[in-house]
């Protein structure tokens, strides 16, 4: 997260040079984890770089922990109970907890702030060539690059790397931001990959 906030500082400096010109100085955007959130925000607002950077700066300046995960007493107690049950009664309940923290607030924030349909409109208007969000396949060991872009761009497969053409959504950002044991892995990343190929 700290690196993503730093990225916005760099974007503010670039915005000062770019000025109020329409469009976007970055035709290809890529990101992982919180950097993927920044990249998708730039893609969504790529018709107006100044507006995109202003919105990103506003979000990062007002960012709080409860925008990412539930930090209330009830959520922490539920997590302690889930993990305690798994440690002491795991043989009996046959279910492991998915993660230490519940990051559903992050999903809700992204859903409310990002119009993913704007990505196709930006590509069609020529403001954007492609956007890629990379996630790790923890069971496969593959790096999954989910991309949306110009029709000439093709999916790819290399050693431990797969490029998957798709319509980006919140699930891709959550998959990219997953941290083993801390934030839940997104089982949908495998499903999203299989349904896109």
Name these PLM-found stretches.
Residues 66-74, 115-130:
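A short alpha-helix-loop-beta-strand transition element characteristic
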Residues 107, 124-197:
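Active-site gating loop/helix substructures
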Residues 106-109, 114-118:
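Extended, Lys/Arg-enriched charged tracts that mediate electrostatic binding to polyanionic substrates
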Residues 1-2, 139:
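Short polar catalytic/cofactor-binding loops
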Residues 2-98, 104, 110, 147-159, ...:
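Patatin-like phospholipase
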């Amino acid at each position: 997260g700290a690196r993503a906030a730093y990225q916005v500082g760099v974007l503010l400096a670039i915005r000062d040079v770019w000025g109020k010109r329409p469009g976007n100085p970055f035709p290809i955007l890529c990101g992982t984890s919180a950097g993927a959130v920044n990249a998708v925000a730039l893609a969504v607002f790529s018709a107006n770089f100044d507006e995109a950077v202003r919105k990103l700066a506003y979000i990062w300046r007002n960012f709080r922990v409860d925008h990412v995960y539930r930090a209330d007493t009830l959520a922490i107690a539920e997590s302690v109970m889930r993990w305690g049950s798994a440690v002491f009664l795991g043989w009996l309940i046959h279910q492991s907890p998915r993660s230490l923290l519940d990051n559903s607030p992050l999903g809700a924030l992204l859903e409310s702030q990002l119009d993913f349909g704007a990505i196709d409109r930006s590509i069609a208007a020529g403001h954007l060539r492609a956007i890629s969000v990379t996630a790790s396949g923890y069971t496969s060991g593959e790096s999954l690059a989910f991309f949306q872009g110009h029709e000439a761009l093709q999916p790819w497969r290399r050693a431990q790397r797969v490029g998957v053409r798709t319509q980006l959504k919140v699930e891709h950002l959550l998959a990219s931001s997953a941290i083993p044991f801390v934030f839940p892995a997104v089982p949908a990343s495998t499903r999203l990959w299989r349904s896109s190929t």
